[in-house]
Every structure is written in structure tokens, then in C-alpha cells.
């Protein structure tokens, strides 16, 4: 009987141990299932993250390709802008050279005009001398005739110089018109270049690559354009000054022309008087 009780107790203990072990295994199984589910969720989450990363990578590559293409286009635009700036510098240099030549011609015309004015003054002096001379003897008449010939020569020389001055003034006016046209063309080109550079600058602001360098180059171009605009304004001011000088010279030429006409009329009267005097002397 004791053996049976001991055996029953041993079996009960074995049963309890088996139950405990079963509970432990069941708990471990549940935990394993939970870990498996958690692992599967993590795998699915990682797959989603991997897909998102791949999508973001594709998008980033597309953006990089687009940015690279835009950067290449902007580099081409900058190269073209640099070419335009160089061409504009050359045009301004040519304009300044044309203005310098115009100023030289204007100075020459001024000198010629001064010579013509001096000749007219000399003619007036000779006329007064002729009027004050006595026509009483043949010797004085000969001297008067020689002086009259000299006065006529001076008048003809003044006419020739006046024609030369008029021709030079016409050339100066033509040069000034061409200079003004070039100045207007240069100003229009600057406006176009400023618009192109403004568009390039706005596009470069959207790029994250080389943004600082692009901004610096944009400021440099703006400074260059500002300098070119100032040069054009100075050239236009010089052209306006030259035009005003030409207008003043034209007025002076008109005045001298009127004086020459009057002098010619006076010379004609003196010649008529001399002819009459010669006739009277011949009659004696």
C-alpha cells in the first residue's frame, strides 16, 4: 500500500512537472509566436521603408539629373552672357573712338572757322583802308587796285574755307548721328542683357548646387552692366555736347556767311567805284 501511495505521489509529481513543463512550453510558444509576428511586422515595415527609400532615391536621382541639366544650361547661358558683355565692351570702345574722331573733326572745323573769321576781319580792315585812301593819282589807284585784288583773293579764300568748314560740319553731324544710333543700340542691348541675366539669376536661385558661386557671378555681371550703362551715359553726354557745339558753330558759320555776302556786296560797290574812277582818269 505504501508502495502504491509512493508511486501515486511520484506519478502526481511527474504529472505536475509535466503540466508545469507544458505551461512553460505553451508560454514559450506564445512568446515565440509573438516574436514571429513582431518580426514579420518589422520585415513588412522594413520592406515598406526599403520601397520608400528606393522611391526617394529614384526621385533624388531624377532631381539630380534635372539639376545637372539646368546647371549645364545656366553655364551655357553665362558663357553667352560673357560673350555679349565682351561684344558690348567692344562696341562701346568703338563708339568712344568714333566720338574722339568726331571731337577732332569738330576742333578742326573750329580752327577753320576761326581762320575764316580772321579773313573776314582782315577784309573789313582792307575795305576801310580802301575807302579812306585818296584816289587822286594813278600811283594810288594802282595800289588800290592791288589791294582790291588781294581783298578779292581773301574773300575767295574765305569762301573756300567756308565751304570746307561746311563740309567738315556735315561730316561731324553724320558721325554724331551714327554715334547716337550706336549709343541707342548699345542701351537696347544692355536692357536685353539685363533681362537675360535677371532670368538666369532667378533660375539659379532654385538650384541648391553652386548657389553661392552663381550669385557671385550674377553680381559681377550686374556690376559690369552698371559700368557699361554709365559709360554709355557718358558717351551720350559727350555726343550731346558735340551736337550743341556743332549747332553753335553752324550759327557762327551762318553769321559769317551773311557777313561775307555783305562784304562781297561792298567789294562790288568798291569795284564799281574804282571802274568809274578809272573811266574818269582815262577821260582826263
From Swiss-Prot:
Modification sites for N-acetylmethionine: 1
Chain residue ranges for the region called Disordered: 1-49, 103-126
Tissues in which the UniProt entry reports expression: Expressed in leg muscle and chest protection muscle (at protein level).
InterPro entries linked: Tropomyosin
Name this polypeptide is given: Tropomyosin
Domain-level remarks: The molecule is in a coiled coil structure that is formed by 2 polypeptide chains. The sequence exhibits a prominent seven-residues periodicity.
Record PROSITE patterns: TROPOMYOSIN (PS00326)
Protein family membership: Belongs to the tropomyosin family.
Alphabetized Pfam families for the sequence: Tropomyosin
Annotated Basic and acidic residues bias: 12-45
GO terms, molecular function: protein homodimerization activity
Superkingdom of origin: Eukaryota
Protein role: Tropomyosin, in association with the troponin complex, plays a central role in the calcium dependent regulation of muscle contraction.
Coiled coil: 1-284
UniProt keyword list: Acetylation, Allergen, Coiled coil, Repeat
Protein species of origin: Chionoecetes opilio (Atlantic snow crab)
Record's subunit section: Homodimer.
